[in-house]
Amino acid sequence: MDSSIHLSGLLSRHDDDATRTSTSEGLEEGEVEGETLLIVESEDQASVDLSHDQSGDSLNSDEGDVSWMEEQLSYFCDKCQKWIPASQLREQLSYLKGDNFFRFTCCDCSADGKEQYERLKLTWQQVVMLAMYNLSLEGSGRQGYFRWKEDICAFIEKHWTFLLGNRKKTSTWWSTVAGCLSVGSPVYFRSGAQEFGEPGWWKLVHNRPPTMRPEGEKLAASTLKVKASKPTLDPIITVEGLRKRASRNPVESAMELKEKRSRTQEAKDIRRAQKEAAGLLDRSTSSTPVKFISRGRRPDLILEKGEVIDFSSLSSSDRTPLTSPSPSPSLDFSAPGTPASHSATPSLLSEADLIPDVMPPQALFHDDDELEGDGVIDPGMEYIPPPAGSASGLLGSRKKVRAPEQIKQEVDSEEEKPDRMDGDSEDTDSNISLHTRAREKRKPPLEKDMKPKGPRYTPVSIYEEKLLLKRLEACPGAVAMTPEARRLKRKLIVRQAKRDRGLPLFDLDEVVNAALLLVDGIYGAKDGGASRLAAGQATYRTTCQDFRILDRYQTALPARKGFRHQTTRFLYRLVGSEDLAVDQSIISPYTSRILKPYIRRDYETKPPKLQLLSQIRSHLHRSDPHWTPGPDAPLDYCYVRPNHIPTINSMCQEFFWPGIDLSECLQYPDFSVVVLYKKVIVAFGFMVPDVKYNEAYISFLLVHPEWRRAGIATFMIYHLIQTCMGKDVTLHVSASNPAMLLYQKFGFKTEEYVLDFYDKYYPLESTECKHAFFLRLRR
């Protein structure tokens, strides 16, 4: 009975092996000077089958995967060379689904009659696939996708000891996980960047776990013939620029070296054709001098009058292929040094393609040294090739990449200037019109649909003004010798002083726009490409990858400290509000829910300020034995209202930094809490609910120093967390803020230490700590 089962099992495995490729290589983690590298290392214990049958369905349903696992999961005995189904084992070896990576000895072969097993050394790709498969069975994630760091890395860290044993956990092990995802895309892993519009989401292409096959299991001759006739996917993951151990024969190495040399010679032929094309164009434009840019740049032609003929705008002929015949998804039109430019350039040209009437793609002009750099791994974004037919879109993106660079021009001597002026008067107009007609004739039809270019000049942000002033102050000698630098420094100082005093700044564009709008309203809307900033609005650019949520609350003209409207009565200025109907419910514009007037009314809490007030009252009536203190007013927790904003802004400018305006929080009052004593605001907290999918961000949380140590901040954090059930809550806290301990009590964990996070907000003379911790509360 056992022999028949064993024979049928071997036959079924041989049939399955016809559709998969064996591999004994996996990704391992290594560190060189603090950087995590991906090393291709052979595994002696076991190999993983990562290539599934491409002809069938992708099996994205969890139910189908569970049934597949119940049929396929078995353990291989090293001694009797049999596969033992998981249902026949006496005990469960792994609590993870699809995990059979053990050196197993069945009870019949063991000396003591007990099953023996030992964890095999897993590769990083096996670990990542096991983690993603088990996450998919749990039903979490978003449409089958999981976040790279928050889900996949968290799962691996939770089961680190069980999966990886006593392997050392380095400080950058998560970057190895990111490398596995990027390198394995799109064969084994699929990115959700295109579906969700943000990087970091990944899923398995085939929702199956990796399959272990012992090294000693041999294939039948018929199976090998089928495998040789059927094209299979190469499961060996290679990154251009990473070293591989010599595992191929000398013949294959020699063939690869010959192919590489042919590509190098081909690139030289292309550059030679480029020079010949330049000579032909030079002869056709007899009196128009042409200047070429250095090798490695796009071959633009610069005319004397500044007219630039950009070869990237010319349409390619039918002889120049726009799609690569190799497995590469598309041509490389990116600039040298970008991750996409490190891929190997395929052989694209034949003898007919070397005709110099049309320039070949710019990716072929790079030197061979540039193409053999180390592969750069993007931890969260998958390369998505553009549509095959949109040639103008590719060329347009190329132009955008090269736009900021300066074009090298030669300076003519004084003797050549008169001759050039004479030549300009006779020949320039005809030459420019000739080249303009030629370029318009060769324009592709899809270029009309391209988006208009942005403005050439953009206003300098407040933070950039601060950095510029700091650089000028660091070079007093150079500034003293240059009148222009002294004038610029004085302008920056005056602008900064006006902002500190709340005075308006002169903006010529704003004045001209106001005059045009005053004459005719349609004048301001004619120029759709140059949209200017509105009055009182600043531009804050961030240098870090994460989007600064705090930037949306910044204004260019902070109000003066103590500023109030002149029409406000003194009584309302004293009590803090002129809204008499405070006990009425409001409707949230964000969720359309009816919000009650109060979240909570606390009669028990006695902050230090209230204790001092009660002592003052009792001291006044200390000689009256019949005096009894009256009931104290409660602390009212309520949602933000428009009348709260001026006081909250002034408190933010006093305790945080200038220029904060929280008027935007009125759009989502559900995610706010304001604490009042009678009509005096003593604390507040705000949360942004729409930072990312499944993530909210606490932007501001403040308790007045005289009202602290009474549990007010604890209740505010609890309330904000409860308003976003099921979402992660994130925040930034200053490195010197003792509230870090309070956040840790709620379960917030430190994810990142951000240097100079508050540098763009604090004034230059501020002594506050400008570094911050980024905390996250996972749900």
Curated annotation (Swiss-Prot):
GO terms for cellular component: ATAC complex; cytoplasm; mitotic spindle; nucleus. Keywords: Acetylation, Cytoplasm, Nucleus, Phosphoprotein. Residues 255-275, 402-423, 443-452 have a biased composition (Basic and acidic residues). Residues 1-34, 247-292, 314-345, 360-457 are annotated as: Disordered. InterPro entries: Acyl_CoA_acyltransferase, GNAT_dom. GO terms for biological process: G2/M transition of mitotic cell cycle; regulation of cell cycle; regulation of cell division; regulation of DNA-templated transcription; regulation of embryonic development; regulation of transcription by RNA polymerase II. Residues 314-334 have a biased composition (Low complexity). The modification N6-acetyllysine is found at residues 230, 291. Coiled coil: none annotated. It holds the Pfam family Acetyltransf_1. PROSITE patterns: GNAT. It comes from the Eukaryota. The modification Phosphoserine is found at residues 4, 284, 413. One of its GO terms (molecular function) is histone acetyltransferase activity. Disruption phenotype: Early embryonic lethality. Severe growth retardation, increased apoptosis, and alterations in the cell cycle. The keyword Nucleus applies. Residues 635-779 form the N-acetyltransferase domain. PANTHER family: CYSTEINE AND GLYCINE-RICH PROTEIN 2 BINDING PROTEIN, CYSTEINE-RICH PROTEIN 2-BINDING PROTEIN. This is Cysteine-rich protein 2-binding protein. It comes from Mus musculus.
